[in-house]
Regions:
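Membrane-interfacial alpha-helical segments at the cytosolic side of multi-pass membrane proteins
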Residues: 54-70, 117-128
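Small-polar-interrupted transmembrane alpha-helices in polytopic inner-membrane proteins
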Residues: 20-29, 79-99, 114
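Interfacial helix-loop-helix junctions of multi-pass membrane proteins
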Residues: 37-39, 45, 91-115
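Short helix-capping/hinge motifs at transmembrane helix termini and TM-loop junctions
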Residues: 31-32, 102, 128
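Short helix-coil transition/hinge motifs at the ends and kinks of transmembrane helices
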Residues: 35-39, 69-78
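Membrane-interfacial, low-structure loops and terminal tails that flank and connect transmembrane helices
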Residues: 1-9, 73-76, 131-133
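Membrane-helix interface segments
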Residues: 13, 75-81, 106-107
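"…centered on the first transmembrane helix and the immediately adjacent amphipathic helix/loop
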Residues: 1-66, 83
């Protein structure tokens, strides 16, 4: 394996990918409404909910990836439930903070966050595309 690839592989096993993705999600979802375009850029119904599904699917993937590699992590056996709890808490926090920047708390956004996370946890672990059941 090439040295740069080995370093990248080691880096992906750290907490940094999960933290960077979490920060990315936060920045995208906390943008003040005055900075958002009035017209949707993509004429797809519920496009904002699709964005939430994708962002929190990534959130679930990166946090599950990190937690699955932790030796001795006391919640390792329950990491899927723990990741879902993280999604709920983080989604609630973001929705609550959006009010302070002129946006609205939307329950449907929170449901899209949770759905995206659960879908990713169901589909990704092990081999891509293979159900856990």
């Amino acid at each position: 394996m090439k040295p740069w690839l080995r370093k990248l592989n080691q880096w992906t096993k750290t907490i940094w990918p999960a933290l960077i993705w979490s920060a990315f999600v936060f920045v995208l979802l906390i943008i003040p409404s005055s900075k958002l375009p009035n017209e949707t850029l993509v004429p797809i119904p519920y496009f904002d909910k699709i964005v939430h599904l994708i962002l929190f699917g990534g959130f679930a993937f990166f946090w599950d990836q990190y937690l699955s590699l932790q030796k001795g992590f006391f919640l390792k056996a329950y990491r899927y439930g723990f990741v879902i709890l993280l999604i709920i808490v983080y989604g609630l926090l973001i929705e609550y903070l959006q009010v302070s920047v002129g946006r609205k708390f939307e329950l449907m956004d929170l449901l899209a966050d949770i759905t995206g996370g659960i879908f990713m946890l169901k589909k990704i672990p092990g081999k891509i595309g293979r159900d856990r059941s």
